[in-house]
Design a protein with these regions (language model features):
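His/Glu-based metal-binding/catalytic segments typifying zinc-dependent metallopeptidases
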Residues: 90-150
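Phosphate-proximal small/polar/acidic motifs at interfaces that engage nucleotide phosphates
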Residues: 153-154
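Charge-rich, well-structured scaffold segments of protease-associated domains
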Residues: 1-92, 109, 128, 158-210
Length: 210
């Protein structure tokens, strides 16, 4: 069940570190930083799901995107099939905006005594998809930690041997982007691994990419 899967996840250091990162960057009042607890699953009832479905699953909230060699015949067929109204409501859902505030602490430690390894999550909020530098940032993050031959992998995995895998990427939310670095390592390598991440960040600042 979902509850069982949740309980399994809460025993994993990667899951706990990811939640801790989001909570520390966005705060508990922001949807991204709100931490789900077991009681939240028990509060979900058929009535709650039915009300949610009726309120939000309707043609007023539906958009259709076509790509490729789109002809008038295709548009006509799509319109005939999906173009009619459905659902009990037609009012589009309002788009809410949430402010967020990061905690002042730069490091958050989540203890789990029986853990064989430590999960390391590093990140900060960044630009959204509609920013003019979006594509440039995507290219930079690919170089930094987005594939097997990235700088993080070459240094921290191949050269130093601190981890089997480390990655960096961007997650996008409606009002924010999140740049995150993720890995797991032996407890003894946590500090030197973090220092090497900072070293690679400094390289991006100081050395032109070739």
């Amino acid at each position: 069940t979902n509850i069982q899967q949740y309980l399994v996840n809460t025993s994993k250091v990667d899951f706990l570190a990811h939640r801790g990162l989001l909570k520390s960057l966005y705060g508990e009042q922001h949807p991204c930083g709100k931490i789900v607890v077991e009681e939240d699953y028990h509060a979900i009832t058929p009535e709650v799901l039915r009300e949610f479905y009726e309120r939000y699953y309707h043609s007023g909230n539906c958009s259709i995107f076509l790509s490729g060699k789109v002809t008038e015949d295709i548009i006509s067929r799509v319109t005939d099939t999906f173009g009619t109204s459905f659902g009990q409501h037609q009012q589009p859902a309002s788009k809410l905006s949430f402010s967020f505030t990061a905690v002042p602490e730069k490091r958050i430690f989540i203890e789990r005594e029986d853990a064989m390894q430590s999960a390391v999550k590093m990140g900060y909020t960044t630009i959204t998809r509609n920013h003019p530098d979006y594509l440039k940032l995507r290219v930079l993050m690919t170089l930094f930690g987005g594939y097997f031959g990235s700088r993080l992998m070459s240094n921290i995995r191949e050269e130093k041997g601190y981890t089997y895998g480390i990655s960096a990427g961007i997650m996008f939310y409606p009002d924010s982007g999140l740049l995150a670095i993720s890995t797991e390592t032996d407890n003894e390598y946590v500090e030197p691994l973090i220092q090497e991440v900072y070293h690679e960040i400094d390289r991006l600042h100081q050395e032109p990419v070739s």
